[in-house]
Amino acid sequence: MDDGHQESALYDGHYEGDFWLFNNSSDNSQENKRFLKFKEVFLPCVYLVVFVFGLLGNSLVLIIYIFYQKLRTLTDVFLLNLPLADLVFVCTLPFWAYAGTYEWVFGTVMCKTLRGMYTMNFYVSMLTLTCITVDRFIVVVQATKAFNRQAKWKIWGQVICLLIWVVSLLVSLPQIIYGHVQDIDKLICQYHSEEISTMVLVIQMTLGFFLPLLTMILCYSGIIKTLLHARNFQKHKSLKIIFLVVAVFLLTQTPFNLAMLIQSTSWEYYTITSFKYAIVVTEAIAYFRACLNPVLYAFVGLKFRKNVWKLMKDIGCLSHLGVSSQWKSSEDSSKTCSASHNVETTSMFQL
């Protein structure tokens, strides 16, 4: 087996290469067999967990924004685009879970389509997170200008979201073009192209990690500086949520991207079993971003939580729980508190 084919057989991470990690049929050692067994059980389980919670959370966000919450601001536009991308992303996972347990039985067209959908929506999600960060910076740090231009910026938000989808589709084309089904002990849907593998890795690391990370550092630094000068009882809550957003991004995305970066420096890392485990586990951690986004970017908003209660009331959940009056009291209290918020803090939480 030549080096190019061996790499195709060994490495298949969703973010860069082929779907099946280190699936080398020529390596029959007990250590490698244990790793393959672990991967074939662990990854499908993770995919299904992320699928279930991601489907529920992102579907709820979409329902609220479509039926209960009008798109009045630029933030609303981005917060609609984010769950849409994450929802399509998680809907590809059951196919990979089945293929991980058995083999790829869905054909070449579905292989290309699902690889393209998976990659495109990953980029859409990460670029939308970047736009949300910039939007929050503008709204909090330049509150007066932001308030006066919300209607105009809403239109720009729709244009930006369209551009995000177009750019994400373009950078996903290698997955569609070079995705194919190959028989290596069993049928697998994989992607490999030595000619552009380095370019794909650079684009992936830039758009999927470094750009969002750098944007978060710069924008949230400005937001924190502004909030520290604000005299408002919600200031500390604002800072906690900012730190939570950054911490979740770092904890879920840094390990896998760091492992990918290290692995790209030497072929030896492709053959080290402990590093194979590291890639699989950190990749699984990165997937949980799709479950956490609804919590971080929607559920923290007072307006969103109120609309969730309205949805529950409409479908008859609250009448059996006897909490309508309790929610009414809480809602009135929230309105009183909201009236005392300054522009910065209101902009931060009225998502």
Curated annotation (Swiss-Prot):
Glycosylation site list: 23-24
Keywords: Cell membrane, Disulfide bond, G-protein coupled receptor, Glycoprotein, Membrane, Receptor, Transducer, Transmembrane, Transmembrane helix
Membrane topology (UniProt): Multi-pass membrane protein
Entry keyword annotation includes Disulfide bond: yes
Biological processes per GO annotation: chemotaxis; inflammatory response
Species the sequence originates in: Mus musculus
Positions in the Extracellular compartment: 1-41, 99-112, 174-196, 269-284
Residue intervals on the Cytoplasmic side: 69-77, 135-152, 225-240, 303-351
Transmembrane segments: 42-68, 78-98, 113-134, 153-173, 197-224, 241-268, 285-302
InterPro entries: CCR1-9-like, Chemokine_CXCR6, Chemokine_rcpt, GPCR_Rhodpsn, GPCR_Rhodpsn_7TM
Intracellular or extracellular location(s): Cell membrane
Alphabetical list of Pfam families matching this protein: 7tm_1
Name by which UniProt lists this protein: C-X-C chemokine receptor type 6
One MF annotation (Gene Ontology) recorded for this entry: C-X-C chemokine binding
Function in brief: Receptor for the C-X-C chemokine CXCL16.
Protein family (similarity comment): Belongs to the G-protein coupled receptor 1 family.
Domain of life: Eukaryota
GO cellular component, one term: plasma membrane
Disulfide links within the chain: 111-189
Main location: membrane
